[in-house]
């Protein structure tokens, strides 16, 4: 940028079409967050009406995680082939239909299937909306695009909690799911009123359709084996998260089977760049492992160990959720100022200062606890708002939506595993200590993975001939692409 351009406020670099594109995607992401958390809000009512066991009730939450990886792959491939806009609209319709079906569900099986549909739609929305907005905004503002967008999910969760308190006491739990019809109307408006992402349009206009991840896996030479592995992964995940298995060895074996299948898919679809894809899955996995114990078990901690009443719990959770939403936006500014990886590391290091006080302060002063949680979540959870920008930079435009959708949603299985780890540690320690120790230790793993740019570093170690030296989204160099101590002159821009 020229000096004169740098003096212009950042928001004036965006035209009306770019703001409209962002607003549409942000509302879609808000609706995604709204729909996803509804089941957690009404789980006790659903369990009571259907006569479910605790395991069956919990499986309705896990169901969305079981299908997410496939939704990210399928709808991401749609975005790579037919455009980000169509994939985003299709994702919104998919999770809206699933939510509406939950409202009509006559029993457990129907609701479980509906939750699978919601998981697929949510995964597709993440990949398609993120790539749509990032590719629509100028390169120097793409961390802001990512962070601002992801804040919509946290806002949607807060809105869902408020709507729950107004709707369910009067009309019952099913009425909450009937609101799921509204995003479909919104999706139809989107289809006619938003432009296609600029990067995708420039890459594909007038050219033959690209070969997507779906083409490679399910229409290629190994399609039969890959279809069988897809069913095997789905069955293994179901038994792990919804099958009430008591044998830890069997669960570990099924988890290992899923890991082998997902790595196999990444190797087939990414070719020589598979080390980058596998490391990105690990980054996301540990990002969920450090953050989701608090996300999932904080309400339990507040109710059981601090003995807070429901109203106080709601107030504290508001601080937490609002902090995460603000943090996504702050992370966007930090990312464009410091660079994506440096901003991520600095924010996580700052959050580490707060994690111990959050669980050491006790429950005597609710406002102090709320403020500590606000800032801890702002720095620790909110910075994940620029994770789509970080992941997307490792993929070329042709494979970005499916690459982002698949790697993120495979790693997101850590979100299903994290509460279990927290609960297991809490059997030996109190819950607050368990959550603090788990989050504190695993955050350092993410700091190392991102700070050392391990995706590029492992790529350089294993398959250097396919190494990408610069971010595909903003053209900034990858620090892990050259050995320690090498001059910056060693960076030579390459295409993968």
UniProtKB/Swiss-Prot annotation:
Membrane association type: Multi-pass membrane protein
Organism name: Salmonella arizonae (strain ATCC BAA-731 / CDC346-86 / RSK2980)
Gene: nanT
InterPro entries, A to Z: MFS, MFS_dom, MFS_trans_sf, SA_transporter
MF terms in GO: carboxylic acid transmembrane transporter activity; sialic acid:proton symporter activity
Protein's UniProt keywords contain Manganese: no
Protein's name according to its UniProt entry: Sialic acid transporter NanT
Pfam families reported for this sequence: MFS_1
Tree of life domain: Bacteria
Role played: Catalyzes the proton-dependent transport of sialic acid.
Transmembrane segments: 22-42, 58-78, 86-106, 116-136, 148-168, 170-190, 224-244, 247-267, 278-298, 313-333, 353-373, 374-394, 406-426, 431-451
Protein's cellular compartments: Cell inner membrane
Reaction equation(s) it catalyzes: N-acetylneuraminate(in) + H(+)(in) = N-acetylneuraminate(out) + H(+)(out)
Stated family: Belongs to the major facilitator superfamily. Sialate:H(+) symporter (SHS) (TC 2.A.1.12) family.
Keyword Transmembrane helix on entry: yes
Annotated keywords: Cell inner membrane, Cell membrane, Membrane, Sugar transport, Transmembrane, Transmembrane helix, Transport
Any single GO CC term annotated in Swiss-Prot or TrEMBL for this entry: plasma membrane
